[in-house]
């Protein structure tokens, strides 16, 4: 990958001039001037996904200039580098190959002179065999009973992805009950353990190194809880499996290393649901549905790696995001799924985007003088409408939004879905076009009221509109379409990182807090006053000690 400061490109300078021309143009004007706007600014993927980006403050010229920026920063070369196994994560000297995990074509992908696909397929086959034994009831616990509950113990990418997917695919789930524990707060594991039976529970310990503080603390607490009933440590092997590469530590914990599922250093945590970390997904929805998830992602990988930029959905969404982030000064993006099963989707890509592109140092090691990754947030519709949409509609901050919905629901209850989708369609229309003062006054007249007498209220009922949105309409949320949707966002994030000249696949920003926590932990072991930190941290620690006494 080339290390190019985007602000020094001619395309960036052209975009700055173009922004000056576009900043006062409204979405309403853009639609009024082009009856074919929807056709020009929307695209479908495999007849399963419609992406409508017409309600944005963009023209064909805008997109052309943004695509020039992608060319000048050598996006095409970066895509080729990632898919070919080049070590584009240079700060950790690693390839970035989550795409290999879902490479259903099985074409060779070479890292350090070795095709990784045989190992990928071997782990998949091992996961298939193990999961079938658990799901069928063939696998027995220490008292001879079949497994009924699965507890995934992980954090970050070892939790957020599997939890999001198992929730999104609940309509496909089998009889096993899934639980997820991540927080080192003892409340999390304690509340889950209240719900399960040690005789029929399988724990998955998801930690590549088997040393992650939060995960191993929870794993040892789960083991202690289990042994209070089971007694003999040999029974641990029937109720614990590991998603790890540290065979020595896994064996010492009491887990049979035959039930250790490996993944590789070219799998980043927040891109790991496609790997052995996805074992909880397989146990929830079955191996065939997991393969469909992989296949959907692979289809999007193929689209991303082969489709020209002007029709490439991840690239288009990435470029539009840069337009708002770097030229309009928008600091956040909202992800708003109109599907309750997708309630963890925004949280998943909060990590996916903010841990990837939340960087202030460029690939040359220099501090940037431009904006990098945005703040990502969101909640399912229609709940968000009764919470934070007020600010999106009438606040002073621009919040570009992605609205996501399925045309077909898994729960066709009465007219619920029509009401849900009526809100989905209405919100993007309202955000784009607003409501003028004239319309508000006419509404009063239609009600037989004199607008002049209500002059004090009229300004508060005016909506400026001109608030940008993308609409992503899925035919139905299936394992395949969900896989494609996740990969769409992954590649959007990568595209933005390439153009913004940052390393998307490391996360050094999480390390300092860990180091300081390891230093502070021993200081909490006694009641002595602390003076080794700044006055604020000392004061907080000492008050904690006083109150716990």
Swiss-Prot record:
GO terms for cellular component: cytosol. It catalyses: alpha-D-glucose 6-phosphate = beta-D-fructose 6-phosphate. Disruption phenotype: Increases acid tolerance in rpoS mutants, defective in glucose metabolism. One of its GO terms (biological process) is glucose 6-phosphate metabolic process. Its main location: cytoplasm. Pathway: Carbohydrate biosynthesis; gluconeogenesis; Carbohydrate degradation; glycolysis; D-glyceraldehyde 3-phosphate and glycerone phosphate from D-glucose: step 2/4. Keywords: Cytoplasm, Gluconeogenesis, Glycolysis, Isomerase. It is found in: Cytoplasm. GO terms for molecular function: carbohydrate derivative binding; glucose-6-phosphate isomerase activity; monosaccharide binding. The active site is at residues 355, 386, 514. Catalyzes the reversible isomerization of glucose-6-phosphate to fructose-6-phosphate. PANTHER family: GLUCOSE-6-PHOSPHATE ISOMERASE (PTHR11469:SF1). NCBIfam families: PRK00179.1. This is Glucose-6-phosphate isomerase. It comes from Salmonella typhimurium (strain LT2 / SGSC1412 / ATCC 700720).
